[in-house]
UniProtKB/Swiss-Prot annotation:
Domain Hexokinase positions: 35-487
Binding site for D-glucose: 194-195, 229-230, 256, 284, 315
Species annotation: Solanum tuberosum
The organism's place on the tree of life at top rank: Eukaryota
Functional pathway: Carbohydrate metabolism; hexose metabolism; Carbohydrate degradation; glycolysis; D-glyceraldehyde 3-phosphate and glycerone phosphate from D-glucose: step 1/4
Protein name: Hexokinase-2
This protein's UniProt keywords: ATP-binding, Chloroplast, Glycolysis, Kinase, Membrane, Nucleotide-binding, Plastid, Plastid outer membrane, Transferase, Transmembrane, Transmembrane helix
Single GO molecular function: glucokinase activity
Residue span of region Hexokinase small subdomain: 90-228
Enzyme class, first EC level, given as a word: transferase
PROSITE patterns noted in UniProt: HEXOKINASE_1 (PS00378), HEXOKINASE_2 (PS51748)
Residues that, per the record, bind ADP: 104-106, 253, 441
Region spans: Hexokinase large subdomain: 229-476
Amino acid sequence: MKKATVGAVVVGTAAAVAVAALIMRHRMGKSSKWARARAILKEFEEKCATPDGKLKQVADAMTVEMHAGLASEGGSKLKMLISYVDNLPTGDEGGVFYALDLGGTNFRVLRVQLGGKDGGIIHQEFAEASIPPNLMVGTSEALFDYIAAELAKFVAEEGEEFHPPPGRQRELGFTFSFPIMQTSINSGTLIRWTKGFSIDDTVGKDVVAELTKAMQKREIDMRVSALVNDTVGTLAGGRFTNKDVSIAVILGTGTNAAYVERAQAIPKWHGPLPKSGEMVINMEWGNFRSSHLPLTEYDHAMDTNSLNPGEQIFEKICSGMYLGEILRRVLLRMAEEAGIFGEEVPPKLKNSFILRTPEMSAMHHDTSSDLRVVGDKLKDILEISNSSLKTRRLVVELCNIVATRGARLAAAGILGIIKKMGKDTPRESGPEKIVVAMDGGLYEHYTEYSKCLENTLVELLGKEMATSIVFKHANDGSGIGAALLAASNSVYVEDK
C-alpha cells in the first residue's frame, strides 16, 4: 500500500514537472518569437532610416538628374518633359472654357466659367461617362467618336448664357493621361497605351488631331487650346489663385512633379524663347533613382514582381499604390518567422496588394486605447480575428515607418526642385515665397503622411527659410486645371 502511494506521488510529481516544463517552453517560445518580430521591425526601421544628411544627398541627386534631363533627351532617369506651357493662368482670365479629362476607363467633360480680373471661378459643372470595354481595344476612330458624342451631348444641354459670341469657337483643355510626345501646346503623339487600352492605330498619331476630327464629324464647334498632363494642370490651378505657385506635386496612386523653369536653362529646348521667358517642365519624377534611396529587401522583391521592374523606383516607395503592399510584405515575414498572428500564416496575407494604403492610413491614425480600428481592419481584410493588443501596436509602428520614409523622401524631392530653381537660400531682400500646389488622395487623406512631408521640408530648409515655404491644396488639376490652361492659351486672349 505504501509502495503504491509512493509510486503515485512520484508519477504525479513527474507529470507536474513535465507540464511546468511545457508551459515554460511555450512561454519561452512565445517570448523568443516576439523577440524575432521585434528584431525584424528594428532591422526594417534601420534600413528605412532617413536622417537629414541622407535626405540632403537625395535632394542633391534629384537636382543633378534634373540638370541631366534638361540637357538632352534620354540623358537622365527623369524625362524632364517640355510641356509647351509658357503662359500660366494669371487669375484675370474670363469667359467659358471646357476640359476633357481622359485618364482611364472613365472620362469627364467640364465647363468652367471664369469671372475675369479677381472674379475667380463663377460656375463649374461636369458630366462623367465610362468607356465600354470593346472601345478600349477597338479603333481610334470608334474611341474618339464615342468621346465626341458625349461632348456633343454635354454642349447641347447647356444654357444660353454659356453660348459663345458669334464667330467664336468654344475652347477646350484636353488632359490625356497616357505617355505622349508633346510637340506644341495643343498637339502630341501617343507613344503607347496603358491602363488596359490597346488601340494600335492611335499609336504614333496626334491625339488632338484625332479628337478634332471626331468633333468636326459631330459638328461641335470647338478647338483644343491645350493638351496637358494632370500635374501641369495642378500647377495651373494653383497659379490661378496664387501667383507665387511655381511647383506642383501629385501624391496619389502614383506621384509626379512639375515646376516653372527659366527657358534659357533648358539646353534641349531649340525653339524660340517664349515671351514669358518661362517653361513648365513635367518631371515624371516617379522614375527617379539614386544610390542614396533607402531601399529594403521588401522594396526589391516588390519591384522584381512588378509589371515594370527597375522602373518608377521613387514612386514605389513614396506613393499610394505601394505603401500598403510594403506593409503587407513585412507583416508576412513576421507571420512566417515570428508567428505574430498565431501558428498558421493567414492565407489572405499572402495575396499581393490586398492591403491598400487607405486601410494602412486608417490603422496608422487609430487613436483608440485598444486600437480597435487596427483589429477591425486585420479581421475584415486579412481574416485575422484574434490579434493581440501587442501585435496591433506592432502594426501601427510598421505603418509609421513606411509612411515616414515615403513622406520624408517626397520632401527631399521637393527640396531638390527648390535647389534647381535657386530658391533654397535666402536673398538679401529676404526669403522668396515658395508656394507648392499639392494634389492627390495620399496627400489629401493620409494626414500623418502629409504632416510629416511638410514638417520635413521646413526642417531641411532651415529656420531662416522655413517661413517662405507654403503648401496649397490645388484640387482637380486634370479637370479645372486643364480648363484654366485653355483660358490662358486662348487664341482670343488678345481680344479681351
